[in-house]
Swiss-Prot record:
This is NADH-quinone oxidoreductase subunit B 2. It catalyses: a quinone + NADH + 5 H(+)(in) = a quinol + NAD(+) + 4 H(+)(out). HAMAP family: NDH1_NuoB. SUPFAM superfamilies: HydA/Nqo6-like.
Amino acid sequence: MGIEEKLPAGVLLTSVEKFVNWSRKSSVWGATFGLACCAIEMMAAGGPHYDMGRWGMEVFRASPRQADLMIVAGRVSQKMAPVLRQIYDQMAEPRWVLSMGVCASSGGMFNNYAIVQGVDHVVPVDMYLPGCPPRPEMLIDAILKLREKIMHEPLGPNGRKMAEARKARGDVPVVPYGSMPSSYRSDKARRAEWTKAVREGREEQLRIENWMKAQPHLQQYEGLKK
């Protein structure tokens, strides 16, 4: 016997945060960003056999302003990285990134100067999906896990304050799993640099600055070259 028994029929009780997050996770719209062979598996997942419309994402959006999920399907070249960042910046808030396949996540077998060694050097990644290429079932599983993450995200300024309070108490890590670029994880000094940037709220600035410093041909345009 709860309060629901005393209310008129047709009344549903919930918190605004849970309701908004439920609506967000139930209508995740993906942006078309296929780069290599992983895109073929992404196309297969979007077909009628797997019926992704069950989760409200049966259509991939051609405009980033109408999308809130970027699935990076394939390796990212150095020339494609600025385009990827521009599309990410044009996406609606809140937005999420799923790195599909080992090439997008760490460069994979393309360990050379032409390929970005992990898309997390360019944009923040919310979910990593291994495989070369991962099957459509694996992509759907990663999307379902991302939906659960969306469901528990804080909402609004009060929610962010609560999340910061939890971080201060040590209830959750200062740097959420998956947000730190892969090249920072093996170096203690760089990990400390990233953690400090997260505390100061400038991790995106640090991510872009480090990527630009690694591109000598772009430094002259950004005024970074001394």
